[in-house]
């Protein structure tokens, strides 16, 4: 294949951003890894850009994954607004203190509950769950080892990992726990 260097470049991008997502000790590093994995996924699905199906698959994958970003980004912003930090250990320490922070948008929402639900939306979008799975079968248009890598090791587990990483925050709002268990 004459495109092996490009393939290795895209694969290197993916393998650079996944450890960044996993080893990040703050929300910004997690978000950069999250976005990088999404970009690498798009590039790898779109690897054979001359094929119409690969083009359609990549074009479908990108907006569906952006849904997850529209949950994660406000969730991170909300955590920063509420806790004045992006560091996970500090957020978890401050979350244990009783908080009566409410957001009023024609209804009263507990701030931590809203943040957790936004994080869940991010995880659902990235992990191809509950309606956001439409791009996943089409991702097989990418090169075979990449298709397996994107599904098993990165995209699906990224959302699950983020929920697990933020689980100390999810302990406090009972409404968010109910939403997660029913999702």
Curated annotation (Swiss-Prot):
Lineage: superkingdom: Eukaryota
Membrane topology annotation: Multi-pass membrane protein
Segment forming the signal sequence: none
Record's keyword annotation contains Transmembrane helix: yes
GO annotations of cellular component type: mitochondrial inner membrane; plastid
UniProt entry keywords in alphabetical sequence: Electron transport, Membrane, Mitochondrion, Mitochondrion inner membrane, NAD, Respiratory chain, Translocase, Transmembrane, Transmembrane helix, Transport, Ubiquinone
TM helices/strands, residue ranges: 7-27, 30-50, 111-131, 144-164
GO molecular function: NADH dehydrogenase (ubiquinone) activity
Main subcellular localisation: mitochondrion
Broad EC category: translocase
Locations listed in the record: Mitochondrion inner membrane
The reaction(s) this protein catalyses: a ubiquinone + NADH + 5 H(+)(in) = a ubiquinol + NAD(+) + 4 H(+)(out)
EC number annotated for this UniProt entry: 7.1.1.2
GO biological process, one term: ATP synthesis coupled electron transport
InterPro entries: ND/Mrp_TM, NU5C-like
Family assignment from sequence similarity: Belongs to the complex I subunit 5 family.
Function noted in UniProt: Core subunit of the mitochondrial membrane respiratory chain NADH dehydrogenase (Complex I) that is believed to belong to the minimal assembly required for catalysis. Complex I functions in the transfer of electrons from NADH to the respiratory chain. The immediate electron acceptor for the enzyme is believed to be ubiquinone.
Name assigned to this protein: NADH-ubiquinone oxidoreductase chain 5
Organism listed in the record: Pisum sativum (Garden pea)
């Amino acid at each position: 294949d004459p495109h092996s260097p490009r393939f290795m470049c895209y694969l290197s991008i993916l393998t650079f951003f996944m450890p960044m997502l996993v080893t990040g000790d703050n929300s910004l590093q997690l978000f950069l890894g999250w976005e990088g994995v999404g970009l690498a996924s798009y590039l790898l699905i779109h690897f054979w850009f001359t094929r119409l199906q690969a083009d359609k698959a990549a074009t479908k994958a990108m907006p569906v994954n952006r849904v997850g970003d529209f949950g994660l980004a406000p969730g991170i912003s909300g955590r920063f607004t509420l806790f004045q930090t992006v560091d996970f250990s500090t957020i978890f320490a401050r979350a244990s203190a009783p908080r009566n922070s409410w957001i009023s948008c024609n209804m009263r929402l507990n701030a931590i509950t809203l943040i957790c639900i936004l994080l869940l939306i991010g995880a659902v979008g990235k992990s191809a769950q509950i309606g956001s799975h439409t791009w996943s079968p089409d991702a097989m248009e990418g090169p075979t080892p990449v298709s397996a890598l994107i599904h098993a090791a990165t995209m699906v587990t990224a959302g699950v990992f983020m929920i697990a990483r933020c689980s100390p925050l999810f302990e406090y709002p009972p409404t968010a726990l109910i939403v997660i268990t029913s999702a």
